[in-house]
Amino acid sequence: MKNRLMWAAKFFAALIVSAFTVSCAPDEDVYKDAIKGIIIESQVPLIQLESNFNGERLSYQIENPNFYDSVKIASGEATPKPAVFQAASLSKVVFSYIVMKMYDRGEIDLDAPLCNYTDIDRFEDKESASKLTARMVLNHRTGLPNWSKSPSSQEWPVSTITFKYPVDSCYGYSGEGFAFLQRAVEKIRGKKIDDVAKEEVFKPLGMEYTSYEWQPMYDTLAVDGYNKDGENRGKGRHPRANVGYTLRTCAADYAKFLQALLDGTGLSPKAKEVFFTPCGEKAIRYAENHRECDNSIAWAMGIGTEENPEFGKVLWHWGDNGSFKALFILIPSANGYLTYFTNSNHGHDIINDITALVIKNREPFAINDWINKD
């Protein structure tokens, strides 16, 4: 009951902000102050946010004065403009879009064994590995663990991959599966994945600050991340491009990508439908603990879905690299999106507050519990 009362208070506060904004044509300081209050309360140092609903577009980069100098905040010198963040698993959705474009052109068969395209040397169980397909990877039904070892470690590229579940038996989130599919795409295209991404996504959409690899501009634009205790953990450079987690971007760039997803840019209607259609099984995040929120969540081709009583199908993904956390929500029925990036371990604590403010949903999204509750 207490949580519902808190949610109701936030929802009505969002309505007040909305009414004030409409009547004042619009006063963006109302949103800015509300977002600033949210990140101060949740101990998030920095947030970038982009949204576009019903023609009302929001674009913010807001610093927390408890982490950055107030004088520099006022002068605009506290953080680089635009700040570049680790996108974490939002990396996967950009890659999924690339795969779906290749599928649309007949360059990859979603149901063909990936061993037709690349080797399976790292897999302990070769028979199971030979059954893996792109569709299984994108639906997170490979049976693989998230990672065999830390993917930024020196040992990871040659580490042995052991199956966690039987192939195609259940939902099981796996970065290792995406890395396997990355190798297949690189073999098909004869190029490194960042070069493929530049051709397919970054250049066509004007995402000039986005890359799977470290770029010289990141020396000044990339921001430091902060752990749960508010300690600076640095920028966190990764040793190699990995579609599971190494994308760096800014919210404005990623918003261009989200608009392209909504519009189906570069995809036939059929491919867009396949992209956004869930596999039919619920995405039960913890096999030993079936939660109520799991009943609303499934996985399409590299993108999460929520069946929402207010908005219908909602498309989403979260990013979690520890000291960098991010989120996007696409609502096709409203032709709108919200995305935000934070440099904080607390970056997902604000999901309900931010969605109530920006989307003005009457009830919390199941997404919040799916991400935050064990």
Regions found by a protein language model. Give the residues of each.
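Bacterial Sec-dependent N-terminal signal peptides
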Residues: 1-31
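Catalytic loop of the DD-peptidase/beta-lactamase superfamily, centered on the K-T-G motif
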Residues: 24-64, 198-199, 203, 235-374
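Stable alpha-helical elements in mature extracytoplasmic
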Residues: 31-35, 91, 110-114, 130-134, ...
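Short, conserved catalytic-motif segment at the N-terminal edge
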Residues: 32-85, 107, 154-161
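Short active-site loop at a secondary-structure junction
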Residues: 45, 71-136, 163-176, 242-245, ...
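Catalytic-site signature segments of enzymes, centered on catalytic residues
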Residues: 77-84, 144-221, 239-255, 259
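Active-site helix/loop module of the DD-peptidase/beta-lactamase fold
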Residues: 86-90, 102-144, 187-230, 266
